[in-house]
UniProtKB/Swiss-Prot annotation:
This is Ribosomal RNA large subunit methyltransferase H. The lineage of its organism: Bacteria, Pseudomonadati, Pseudomonadota, Alphaproteobacteria, Hyphomicrobiales. S-adenosyl-L-methionine binds at residues 76, 108, 127-132. The keyword Hydrolase does not apply. Its main location: cytoplasm. It is found in: Cytoplasm. One of its GO terms (cellular component) is cytoplasm. Homodimer. Its EC number is 2.1.1.177. It is an enzyme of class 2 (transferase). GO terms for molecular function: rRNA (pseudouridine-N3-)-methyltransferase activity. Belongs to the RNA methyltransferase RlmH family. It comes from Bartonella henselae (strain ATCC 49882 / DSM 28221 / CCUG 30454 / Houston 1) (Rochalimaea henselae). Specifically methylates the pseudouridine at position 1915 (m3Psi1915) in 23S rRNA.
Amino acid sequence: MHVSIFAVGRMKKGAEQALVHHYLDRFSKSCSAVGFHFKILQEISESRAPTACQRMEEEGRRLIEFLPEKCRLIVLDERGKTVSSFAFAEQLGFYRDEGVRDVIIALGGPDGHNEQIRNRADFLLSFGFMTWPHQIARILLTEQLYRAVTIASNHPYHRF
């Protein structure tokens, strides 16, 4: 199963970007053992529209243009469900076992996702009630992807 991240905005070079690449590298090297394959980190340019509504609409259209047919879409959203690392790993495993070819995990821009994207989502995921800077959300996501693989393979990185 291919796993991709679609993120609105560009990540600047620095410690945060290095950490994202660190976890993506670990995920990529470990994921084939449990039937996953990291496909792409697709950056979608932020809209420069004057209002939040217009920006979310434009970014949502761009995101949808990149979605593969019949993919499962996990959307990071403050209104989403907060789950444990184990439950996140189970959800990915469920998609894999269903025979899903592509899972896309979408991170919105500063204004979040529009209603169309939230309605298209197969799963709305939240990293808690706090608001996280985009760079930190990317780090959290990539670490949790790596952790999901270690859970699925009973690797000691994730201790119960």
